């Protein structure tokens, strides 16, 4: 390990640790609200959840600067724009479901950044694998955020999802449910496993993607249909200066955040589908979802041929905070508690 990599590595770990401990402590401080007013407690947790969206956006900005080109279907032309500083601004439905193809372990950070551009970063609910819930501090915090941890055992996941969806239906605030239907990131072994399954059920295998898993998304939509407006579909493609066949081989978490391996460009194409128009029968939904994935595959074909996804306009930006001082908001709860404690101490002493 070179000196440069060592400095980057321990700087990243320090920033992540300080930020995570601060956010988790802020969550715990608000616990008494749960026993006083649950709606107020949920709003408080959303407030602390926004800190996490800011933290992870800042970590990408600082340790893995990522140029982004965003395109969208023509009917969405008025929902995306750049502010005077070149930061992306997004107008999203107040209650929505977000799906995306899964290329990297860090994909969820980019989806959270997109939620940040829509001012919904405090209202995301992400589906993650069950093992992550036990990560010290980070996992505990995500449990308080009510993220949905899945074991890939349907009987158990069915109960977990049902419990969380009951909560989400009753939330009076914004909601953005985020999931990756492919279930894992794209590498040679997962692609071949998906190919075997495609051959088994007799469907066409995409060239650049894995087949999406149907059951979880179908159940999510069926349970939330009456409380959600739109489903947003993000197609991600990470340009690799190498290039390697699979982005995950080039851009592992250590390579991105410790070694500083640069992502040449992240291409994102956004589509939107009214929840009310998505099929309600599982067989029809399966066909519908596979068709969306074949369309995503063609979008990537177009990008590889022309250098860009199709769209009426291309927005060029970077993953970053709108204002660097936003990172200080992470400490707002602790600062308030410290100041209040000092005033209380002075009051008692006099």
From Swiss-Prot:
EC category name: transferase
GO biological process: phosphatidylinositol acyl-chain remodeling; phospholipid biosynthetic process
Keyword vocabulary terms for this entry: Acyltransferase, Endoplasmic reticulum, Membrane, Transferase, Transmembrane, Transmembrane helix
Domain of life, per lineage: Eukaryota
Cysteine-cysteine disulfides: none
Gene Ontology CC entries for this record: cytoplasm; endomembrane system; endoplasmic reticulum; endoplasmic reticulum membrane
Gene Ontology terms, MF aspect: acylglycerol O-acyltransferase activity; acyltransferase activity
Membrane spanning stretches: 10-30, 51-71, 327-347
Localization, UniProt: Endoplasmic reticulum membrane
Pfam families in the record: Acyltransf_C, Acyltransferase
Topology within the bilayer: Multi-pass membrane protein
Entry's EC annotation: 2.3.-.-
Major location category of this protein: endoplasmic reticulum
SMART domains hit by this protein: PlsC
Stated family: Belongs to the 1-acyl-sn-glycerol-3-phosphate acyltransferase family.
Protein name in UniProt: Uncharacterized acyltransferase C428.14
Origin species: Schizosaccharomyces pombe (strain 972 / ATCC 24843)
Record lineage: Eukaryota, Fungi, Dikarya, Ascomycota, Taphrinomycotina
